[in-house]
Amino acid sequence: MRSKFKDEHPFEKRKAEAERIRQKYADRIPVICEKVEKSDIATIDKKKYLVPADLTVGQFVYVIRKRIKLSPEKAIFIFVDEVLPPTAALMSSIYEEHKDEDGFLYITYSGENTFGDL
């Protein structure tokens, strides 16, 4: 999936920003979180997050649920490189495995457990 954030900001600017963030906040992970385009779930109010390295994927999902005011009975799925990451995984390990060449970790979310054409 194409990232709107990548489309709106040139690579050099993104890379410089991620490097600055990592230098200033070594214990935090720069994350870009965007909705899967064709999903009917609510759009998040901000894309950029600075998450603690020891946060789990499940805890991050909780943060996203709160930001989009998702009711408890509704499902949400997050994807990293089009794959559902393990809920218990630490954001730091997901970052090390999947960070983009610009230094950000790109996460997409959807109300459906499918990726691509819905």
Curated annotation (Swiss-Prot):
Site (Cleavage): G116, D117
Propeptide position ranges: 117-118
GO biological process: asexual sporulation resulting in formation of a cellular spore; autophagy; protein secretion
Plastid among keywords: no
Residues with a covalently attached lipid (Phosphatidylethanolamine amidated glycine): G116
Description of the deletion phenotype: Impairs autophagy as well as the formation of aerial hyphae and conidia.
Subcellular location: Cytoplasmic vesicle, Autophagosome membrane; Vacuole membrane; Lipid droplet
Keyword terms, alphabetized: Autophagy, Cytoplasmic vesicle, Lipid droplet, Lipoprotein, Membrane, Protein transport, Transport, Ubl conjugation pathway, Vacuole
Mod. after translation: The C-terminal 2 residues are removed by atg4 to expose Gly-116 at the C-terminus. The c-terminal Gly is then amidated with phosphatidylethanolamine by an activating system similar to that for ubiquitin.
Entry keyword Lipoprotein: yes
Membrane disposition: Lipid-anchor
GO cellular component: autophagosome; autophagosome membrane; cytoplasm; cytoplasmic vesicle; fungal-type vacuole; lipid droplet; phagophore assembly site
Superkingdom of this protein's organism: Eukaryota
Pfam families: ATG8 (PF02991)
InterPro entries: Atg8-like, Ubiquitin-like_domsf
PANTHER family in the record: MICROTUBULE-ASSOCIATED PROTEINS 1A/1B LIGHT CHAIN 3-RELATED (PTHR10969)
Sequence similarity: Belongs to the ATG8 family.
Record function comment: Ubiquitin-like modifier involved in autophagosome formation. The atg8-PE conjugate mediates tethering between adjacent membranes and stimulates membrane hemifusion, leading to expansion of the autophagosomal membrane during autophagy. With atg4, mediates the delivery of the autophagosomes to the vacuole via the microtubule cytoskeleton.
Protein name stated in the entry: Autophagy-related protein 8
Organism the protein comes from: Aspergillus oryzae (strain ATCC 42149 / RIB 40)
Lineage of the species this protein comes from: Eukaryota, Fungi, Dikarya, Ascomycota, Pezizomycotina
